[in-house]
Amino acid sequence: MAAGVFTAAGINLQLQPAASDTGDDWLHAVGSRLYDMNGNEVWLTGANWFGLNCSERCPHYLWSADCDDLLREVADRGINVIRFPISSECLIEWMNGEPKQLTGGGMQAAYNPPTDMDDGNGGIVKAGTYGSINKEFVESDGKTYIDTERAFDIILGKCKKYGIKAFLDVHSPHADNSGHVYNLWYGKEMADGTMVTTQLWIDSLVWAAEKYKNDDTLLGFDLQNEPHGKGQEGSAAAKWDDSTDENNWAYAATQCANAILEVNPHALIFIEGVEQTLSGAMAGDYWGMPDRQTNSPYIPAWWGGNLRGVRDYPIQLNGSGNSQIVYSPHDYGPSVYDQTWFAKDFTTQTLLDDYWYDTWAYINQEEIAPLLIGEWGGHMDGAKNQKWMELLRDYMINNHINHTFWCLNTNSGDTGGLWSSFSYSINNVSDTSNGTTIFWEEDKYALFEKSLWQTLETGKYIGLDHQIPLGINGTGLSLNEFYADYAATEGSNLDGGTVLSQSGSIVTPSQTTTTESTPLDLNYGDINEDGKVSINDVIVYNRYIAEDTTVTVTAKGLENAEVTGDTVVNSDDAVKVLRYLASFITYEELAP
């Protein structure tokens, strides 16, 4: 479909061009939900695996376990996406063609002997007899470690093999095991003395977007982990406003996202919040002023958790870029810090009233954009922290909120992990195992498992790859398998339990739950011209905007579709239709 201007009934409709297709698994947003290229809704339900952000520049615990074993079991256990924290320093090294070499401190890797060899007695010693762990991560001699960039490419390939999707999270400017405590995305030196600037941060992410633009295993980029700092720190703290100040996270994220999408318009852009925003408590309050004991000028939140600024200063990207935005707050429980909203006998409603709604939940509820809770998790204390985890888990399930649990690793002091320990034996190597036995925190996994995307009756885990099922043990499905064989029958736990028609409409055995309008001569939002406005129209919007050549939209359909008054048929129109379907606006307000 060529870009241009189409005139219908006196309305100039500018058709938005889309980039050439670079894979069939890229995702985009309409309202608060994510969809695939066919207009089918998807749900990202995954976990974090950190280590690339650290001095080892490699996901942790590959010093104890085989990567293939770990990822296979992660997939078999239903995790359909992994958030990989990384440092700007590591990305810059890769960009400059100077990746560090892996070391034994970060990974145990060997293939000994590297080839079959004569045992000296007329027999053969098979390759790998004396050592076969992470063998793809050493050179042909079976012992020299490869570099960190090649290692990540291998890890990404294994994710693809098992139907797992991934995205990178810039966790800190510098490679440091405690780098996350630094406030900003710029202003720290690399080991070689190079200062990580805002421009270098952007350049390294654009380089990564270019490198992986043809591999939809890597779905997108979390631009910066937990921008934070107290308001009274002024320019040393991340803020969210309409300025062009370097510490304005909203401005920096906009510049970075636009640059990434110029290279790969299909990538998802995950944008976290800040720590504090201005409260407006008193006239004349300003960012950087001293705090007050009462009537504070600042509203606090978790690091990266404060997205209040989106209401007044939403991220606005070039072209159709807003369709790639996913806002990504972090949320934790009292075992990390006993915040004021945990002081009472809290419930879902008190958490919404005291913190969640105005801080981030409104973005989902008001159909502004999708959410992905990039970090949540904690210790199983049998008390307040566990209660909070269960409440947040159920809220995410019931409100189609994407999430990545913190974390797989066992070595997160604040939270612990889903893994408990590992053992490896060369004697256990077979066609289905490289010898790793993985022990899980089964009680924590059981709590978390309910939030994984799965079918309602058979409990099949649903992957995000159209062709490759999630895992190999028969418990997982590809996206095509789910929509062909399960969506219209048993459905899934998305939205707390839904059955979907093959066109993506939510149904129950007795009735549809979509909102329909009375047929009119000019039916705003009715892009498919079936005489009503329903979720089916939103699906057609998705496919049209993505330049799906199998969908047909007539001139009258385009006239109906333009509801924002800007003469452009794009995701803004689809969002407005979703707001109408959710009863946030009337049909009269749907008209441009």
What are these regions (language model features)?
Residues N53-H60, Y111-E149, N183-Q199, P227, ...:
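The substrate-binding groove and active-site-proximal loops of carbohydrate-active enzymes
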Residues D353-G504:
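Substrate-binding cleft of secreted/luminal carbohydrate-active enzymes
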Residues W63, D192, I202-G220, Q224-I401:
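Extracellular glycoside hydrolase catalytic/binding regions
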Residues V42-G51, N80-I86, C90, K165-D169, ...:
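Structural recognition of the beta-strand scaffold that forms the well-ordered cores
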Residues M1-A3:
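N-terminal export leaders
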Residues T7-Q16, S505-P592:
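Cellulosome-associated attachment modules in secreted, modular CAZymes
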Residues L13-R83, W94-G122, E139, D485, ...:
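N-terminal carbohydrate-binding accessory modules
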Residues P59-N177, K211, N248-P265, N385-T404:
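Aromatic-lined substrate-binding rim segments of carbohydrate-active enzymes
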